[in-house]
Amino acid sequence: NAVEKGFELSEASNTPVMLELRIRACHVHGHFPTKDNVRPAFTLKDAIEHPKRDVNRIVLPPSSYMHEQEKIKDRWPAAVKFIQEHQINEFFSSSAKDFGIVLQGGMYNGVLRALEVLGLADAFGESKIPLYVLNVTYPLVDAEFKTFCTGKRGMLIVEEGQPDFIEQNIHAILRKADLQTRVHGKDFLPMA
């Protein structure tokens, strides 16, 4: 599903989308439904036989300014709209209302297993702590963060790698919205 939605997101926002397959994801095993591959409407053969050049798509000055304006006015809002409409990021709620965990999608199984060891989740994915799973980490959807964090005293960010890009962005989103939810992440968790 992530691959299919990634391609759809790319088309909806006219932006390249990257699917990151990390070591942790590559070592997971199990069963999942698949779909047939879909051939592209425009093939390599088409590109060779009927090349189309749009010099405005080449990112060199002065076109770079135009590209930046297009990103802010068109592509970014289109990506956010697509993410929200297709519910690509996931929310898992529970009885705990005053705190939650925000995590990257690829870390879901590891976080759930850690919660299970602590007695805060079961093997079937039922967590006693609300989870906001970011299956798309860029762009972040401000409205989803505001909804998830409203009324919560604290938030733990589980972010892989360095630096703490997501954590910094969440701070900015919440402070601009005047939400005083405390945000913790790299200060509580190992640095790598």
Predicted regions and their residues:
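Flexible, low-complexity linker and terminal segments
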Residues: 2-192
